[in-house]
From Swiss-Prot:
Listed EC numbers: 4.1.99.5
This protein's record includes keyword Transmembrane helix: yes
Membrane topology: Multi-pass membrane protein
UniProt-listed GO biological process terms: 4-alpha-methyl-delta7-sterol oxidation; sterol biosynthetic process
Family (UniProt): Belongs to the sterol desaturase family.
Known catalytic reactions: a long-chain fatty aldehyde + 2 NADPH + O2 + H(+) = a long-chain alkane + formate + 2 NADP(+) + H2O
Gene that this polypeptide is encoded by: GL1-11
Tissue expression profile of the protein: Expressed ubiquitously.
Keyword Nucleotide-binding attributed: no
Protein name in the entry: Very-long-chain aldehyde decarbonylase GL1-11
Length: 266
């Protein structure tokens, strides 16, 4: 029954918009809705001092600094993200993107999304490490690190060149598999929620990293923002095993060991 209801809803959606509109404008609006609704809470928590005991860093951004981030994000999203969605549609269509019924079986959806997460994490890790080389950091990646004390919305605050560079890691999986638009939307939503959580600046008892062994999360990524760029490590986007395999989490692990020994948070 749930499947038939979803099919009916999808049929109504595809009957109201063209596939081009769904893959571009509607995708953009879905991204903006999920991104800002999931990212605003940590901004408000920081601004009004809520859940202070769960805040990873004691420092906070000023309201004007937060507002600056939001305004630039809107500019970047409209001037970079939306045009990229429009221009990449023919390529996705060529690679097999479809929006028609039937919707893919749940096993196909799950397997594809898991593949996207693993592939994105691998590509992002190496791309992110490259961005921490001296020249690229100075001219590109330093924009993202303007917020040494991150909050959810800073997850997508970056130089336009970085948006395109690391954005490749997000779209290469779907481009390879030619997914159904429904799967693409689910992947986008989950990826947005993941990166917003990783940049939230808060580590709660219910944070995903407390339950998912290989998941990095907010504490893992917050360390990356608060130390010198040449020593930050923790380059992967979602999981921890890439940093563990290549030894780029050693400083973080040492810091956590000292923190646990002293019984206090860094």
């Amino acid at each position: 029954m749930a499947a038939s209801a979803l099919d009916s809803a999808w049929e109504g959606l595809t009957g109201s918009f063209t596939e081009f509109q769904l893959a571009t404008v509607v995708t953009f609006l879905l991204h903006e809705t999920v991104f800002f609704l999931s990212g605003l809470p940590s901004l408000l928590f920081e601004r009004f001092g809520l859940f202070a005991k769960y805040k990873i860093q004691k420092k906070s951004n000023t309201p004007s600094y937060q507002n600056r981030c939001v305004l630039r994000l809107i500019l970047y999203h409209v001037c970079v993200n939306l045009p990229v969605m429009v221009l990449s549609y023919p390529a996705f269509k060529f690679m097999g993107l479809r929006s028609s019924l039937p919707l893919p079986h749940w096993t196909v959806i799950v397997s594809q999304v898991l593949f996207y997460f693993v592939l994105e994490d691998f590509i992002f890790y190496w791309g992110h490490r490259a961005l921490h080389t001296k020249w690229l950091y100075k001219h590109v990646h330093s924009v993202h690190h303007e917020y040494a004390t991150p909050f959810g919305l800073t997850s997508e605050y970056a130089h336009p060149a970085e948006i395109l560079f690391l954005g490749f890691a997000t779209i290469v999986g779907p481009a390879l598999t030619g997914p159904h638009l429904f799967t693409l939307w689910l992947w986008m939503v989950l990826r947005v929620l993941e990166t917003v959580e990783a940049h939230s600046g808060y580590h709660f008892p219910w944070s995903p990293s407390n339950f998912l062994p290989l998941y990095g999360g907010s504490d893992f990524h917050d360390y990356h923002h608060r130390v010198l760029y040449t020593k930050s490590g923790n380059y992967a986007s979602t999981f921890v095993y890439m940093d563990w395999l290549f030894g780029t989490d050693k400083d973080y692990r040492n810091a956590k060991a000292i923190e646990e020994k002293d019984g206090k948070h860094l």
